[in-house]
């Protein structure tokens, strides 16, 4: 179903995207292959806007002339253009090409005529420096000419907004793949996104109309938002989906805002800034949150702002605790939780660190405790390694839900989908594996059935496991076990009648929350240290989620006899080979 989106009625998405990408033929030499997108992406945006505005071009110019002395004229011009953007320049692509001697000056004049929302996009693309490179290499005229040809036509009479969105998405994918790992940091492939959307929407009642809000706190090029919107409309096309996103990288923000404009959405919902230190959606609440924030990245740049907000307690986003400064991914989880509506649901990608890093009482453990004790942790899905373009490590989808169905209350589902993939024919960066449609259906089935089970695929080696746990399973009490200082007579030294602890003999034990601490102490400690006691003032509660331990499968080692026999066989084969070799030499 996902792939069908690239075969729309009236226009073949991949074919059109290929035709546009082939404009790169004019860039060979002055631009390296991984730089083609620096020209093609902004030019695609500009040409789409140009072709949309062309029918109302004269009307906009007339309205501009009559209203240009007004303090505020945006409303008049957007009404005249019929879009949320406009252009007041007298130039079109045709008239630009009619004057090749002044192509740079006229093209810059044309770009300066765009409305402020488009100007913001071009500034974030840093397109001015790209124009200079094209001028210096005598390619600007050729590029404009190529985009003004039939293959570069992007008017709404031939290409619907949704189709143009998919064309642009395909171009973004090509750019990301050609750029390798750096761009991959901002691009999550569709197979992963579709799994996340299917999990988010698995229990959704979308039979009625209305409005649904979707938020991505680290949206990159906004592919997660567009895929989520697509999935919701597949279930009910009458639902109005409003997308919101924030991004800190200028070029990927430009792509995201362009995509929103191209699709006919509200570009004001795409906002620039650092989510951790410059929250652009303070006070907002969303039905769905889907995100792949950076992991393993420090938050030193945001430290001052984050700690100041943490000091506000429940008035801020980071009251439960702060992770170590070297890894800020849990801060994004807290940001998402603060923006989840009472019936909200979130799917967010993390690496393995948030599962277990930090001792009892530490920031990471307190964040896990906050999530689990509020019964918001719905499921964690382990993906295969080599799923992303820029990292080969294991990754996990955390599913959080503030409105769990009754049968999921007080429970957490762990799904090991690390064997649920198929190898790609050709890797892209470090992405060597794909979640196929069938694999995605298996994981969605496991999530929906909510039981201890193993689901097997049609091909050998493809399966996913599901296990259900009580919330308390992941909690423990960390107790401090003391033993006394012994005097020369072998008896404990006393102070005010109490034995004094020997710091050299001090130890700790993690007692599962489901166990009685005193019973554990009697069973596990006193038989080996009868003079020990618990310093109950130092007891702390911690939480960890040891996925590997829960899904560990014991492999019976090969019998020693079989190993020895195999060695003897190999030795005999080597001896025979040597005899044949030297026998021929004689």
Q: Can you describe what each PLM-predicted range is?
A:
Residues 389-483:
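Flexible, glycine-/basic-rich loop-and-beta segments that form/coincide
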